Amino acid sequence: MKYQDLLAIAGCIANAGAVSVSGAAEGFAKGVTGGGSATAVYPSTTAELVSYLGDSEARVIVLTKTFDFTGTEGTTTATGCAPWGTASACQLAINQNNWCTNYEPNAPSVSVTYDNAGILGITVKSNKSLIGSGSSGVIKGKGLRIVSGASNIIIQNIAITDINPKYVWGGDAITIDNADMVWIDHVTTARIGRQHLVLGTSASNRVTISNNYFNGVSSYSATCDGYHYWGIYLDGSNDLVTMKGNYIYHFSGRSPKVQGNTLLHAVNNYWYDSSGHAFEIGSGGYVLAEGNVFQNIDTIVQSPVDGQLFTSPDSNTNKVCSTYLGHVCQVNGFGSSGTFSQADTGFLSNFAGKNIASASAYTAVQSTVPSSAGQGKI
């Protein structure tokens, strides 16, 4: 065997041993294993990445470069609409499923040209771990779709960027719908047309969203101010969602919107710099928020709250949590932010017997989360 061949084999063995899932999921998706101990594969083309994610094998898929889907499926020029005006900083809307026609009939019609690859994400099937190597694993121009019964999936240490950011309905970064046991960890999302994360109307069951950096800075937004509106939308029919340690930055709304039948434990997250609101809680949204920091968030929760909300308002009230979560809830911290005080307790029994993420005092969040959330921070 040639010396060069031996070096290549040694390099592959080193790579396979060097990259693996870091840590373990806390909260509702505790126990998720993804691709488990499967031999790591290293896709080199967009087609190979799509194939690995969409097959029936248990896989550990390692990204070592940028996979740019821009232009891979062509572009479409069509008539859309401008619901928020035609100023240069305003998002335009694609007339997807006749949205402009049905919901914005009075909005000006405009020509839109968008990249087809962004509209629908890459299908991710069961028993997959998708891992980035260092800070080099990027999916550009296309998101991920965990749907149709997919389960036991880990997405860790990657970035998803640049999905038709000018256009509403241009595509989502991560879609979860009709799934179970999904862990999204240390992912960075930026410059997305629609939702950075969406859990659709079917049951997504047990999901943990941890240590991610949702970056809402954009040249285009529905509020025409550079603050992305479409952040995180949790709309499932039977969803248990843990959000812990996330950095949610520069949004003007829906960060998150919670409704359907969704139990959300929002713990030790850092919201920073919003031109609108953070939480929007619709019917069927049940939110417990503890140990978070809200900095420069004028409207923490949009009125009215049509679901139920426990904001962990004070140490005495928070004692009720110990019965159902196994710990006294932590108060939240605020800086230059609006009010956030509601103590609905009727839904707290829904946490009983579940896997619950631990909670730290909010004082540790501001100094640690921005520097530890997102890709390359493991």
Swiss-Prot record:
It holds the Pfam family Pectate_lyase_4. The keyword Secreted applies. GO terms for cellular component: extracellular region. Its main location: secreted. Keywords: Carbohydrate metabolism, Cell wall biogenesis/degradation, Disulfide bond, Glycoprotein, Lyase, Polysaccharide degradation, Secreted, Signal. Its EC number is 4.2.2.10. SMART domains: Amb_all. Glycans are attached at N127. Belongs to the polysaccharide lyase 1 family. This is Probable pectin lyase B.
